[in-house]
């Protein structure tokens, strides 16, 4: 199966995977997860070839098989947006955010209405942020939305204690933006940015097939 994946023979790899499941050599949950990754890989290949209809179908299939797989959900949402079905895109992303918040999901959710005002975006995103409200990703997203709306005190409140309890490059960069927006000295802003340079990057996922790390 790995050889097939290396050759981008996603159909063959999925057939091998199904054979392993039927033979009892693989647990069903592992099969679902790996099949979703293969479907996602196929979707990316199709996107590169410019076959948008097939890409949407493959991406939606991948999302149904494994709703916690972030890239599949994003591709499925992009497919719905291209079809003029923004409500379906929002449902896919909201469901996935409820399983595992991730910045790529927020970016895809923003793309549903790219020209909205910061205030309108803050309101629309509430359907997303009410899922997993105490997750660090949700807290950072709320902070970003308030920064865009130039409500810096609320942006700082949204971050909570993340910069001390769970500092990442992103949360520290957000704190720098909050300080700058609040009128802090340049030295204070630089201090936060300096800390961000050496902080952990945040969530990543590892492809089961290519073993590459993706942010």
Over which residues does each language-model region extend?
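Repeat-based scaffolding regions
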Residues: 1-215
């Amino acid at each position: 199966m790995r050889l097939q994946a290396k050759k981008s023979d996603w159909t063959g790899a999925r057939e091998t995977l199904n054979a392993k499941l039927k033979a009892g050599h693989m647990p069903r949950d592992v099969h679902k997860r790996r099949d979703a990754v293969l479907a996602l890989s196929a979707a990316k290949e199709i996107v590169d070839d410019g076959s948008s209809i097939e890409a949407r179908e493959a991406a939606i299939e991948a999302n149904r098989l494994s709703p916690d797989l972030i890239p599949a959900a994003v591709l499925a949402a992009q497919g719905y947006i291209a079809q003029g079905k923004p409500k379906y895109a929002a449902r896919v992303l909201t469901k996935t955010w409820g399983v595992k918040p991730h910045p790529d999901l927020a970016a895809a959710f923003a793309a549903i209405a790219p020209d909205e005002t910061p205030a309108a975006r803050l309101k629309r995103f509430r359907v997303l942020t009410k899922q997993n409200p105490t997750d660090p990703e949700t807290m950072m997203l709320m902070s970003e939305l308030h920064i865009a709306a130039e409500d810096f005190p609320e942006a700082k409140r949204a971050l909570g204690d993340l910069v001390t309890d769970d500092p990442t490059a992103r949360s520290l960069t957000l704190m720098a933006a909050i300080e700058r927006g609040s009128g802090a000295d340049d030295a204070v802003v630089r201090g936060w940015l300096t800390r961000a340079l050496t902080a952990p990057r945040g969530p990543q996922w590892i492809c089961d097939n290519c073993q590459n790390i993706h942010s």
